[in-house]
Amino acid sequence: MSAVSSSRTWRTFLATLAAAGAFGLVLLAAPSDAQTATEKETTAAPSETTTAAVRPFRANVPDEALVDLRRRIKATRWPGGETVGDLSQGVQLATLQELVRYWGTDYDWRRAEAKLNALPQYITTIDGVDIHFIHVRSRHPNALPLIMTHGWPGSIFELLKTVGPLTDPTSYGGRPEDAFDLVIPSIPGFGFSGQPTGTGWDPDHIARAWVQLMMRLGYTRYVAQGGDWGAPISGAMARQAPAGLLGIHLNYPASVPPEIDRAIRNGDPAPAGLSAAENAAFEVLKNFSAKGAGYRAIMGTRPQTLGYGLADSPVAFAAFIYDYNGGEPQHSLTKDEVLDNVTLYWLTNTAVSSARIYWENDNKSNTSASVQKTEEISLPVAVTVFPGEIYRAPKSWTQRAYRNLVYFNEVDKGGHFAAWEQPQLLSEDVRAGFRPLRNQRSS
């Protein structure tokens, strides 16, 4: 795609993007011939990735977009405050106002943009949709290719802290033989990837697209990893068992047995005979289903209706995103980290297109073993359980769900956004989980 001059008016720029079918409010430009220092250190020559089907990408949002964002923030009409002293009604007014004050005055998107542009990024078109991805080749020989998928309300930003530990383990206390070549795509409808104009982009379709992506990059043996939506997408890849895929690692497994899933959906008490760990998981899942899954219901049934407000008000969208990290992401992430993610959604106008993955998934559970058809997975599966996850998957359930479970570990800190919150810990477990597969030949 040709570069667009940032001197054009914001209105003209939007019209140009709409006519070209581009994705949201981003500016694309091919990188200069000279790589950044980071690119030189972390990846092989661009020619190893760039082909006729794979184009270099750099983000450069027009100044007008950032001016417009601050104008909208300044014009916010705030609601009244909550009538309780806790988070039971959602994000507290004072908390959000503090975040938004920073967003509208001191937050610097250009810093976030530079962080992305320090890494090799590309665009390729698969099944008519542009797929944006980061591709970092390890400096270590015999690195194992790994495709890693984000979730909602996350983005590629949630995975960036793992790039160093996974591609250059010796700089982070690891061994050279544990190195990965890392591919981090943006899910269709998210970030800089294209927004599908038709239906059918469910996790199975995305999984097939990821297989095409790895083939297009020349990888004949590789592994996959994911949490949140990255988990069912990686699980779908394992069910499809394409030639070259050696195994998967999940930090949000679909371990919930059918009888547990059924009891939760029906509002029944816990089945008899559960262990302490199983009963604890049941109670957490039951509470989440009753009080924490409202976002899934609305996005799974009416994403378009929801999107009108979220696409028009940055503060409304920020509140929606903020709420789904327990309403307190500041305990594990900095303000800048929270806002990097929120601002990426805003600038690419992907509130609706990202929500649509829930509709495409027919509002199905991503934690149910039967719904996710884990019985069809014969490839090796590694699982890491984080204590702050939506539920702590018991080993007994996970062994039952995945017949070829080769690695299971419970760690002592971290939550749903494991790669963001505990990148070193997750990276160490990804290394350990895939270590037995490194010398394995693909099917």
Locations of the language-model features?
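Conserved acidic catalytic loop of the alpha/beta-hydrolase fold
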Residues: 204-222
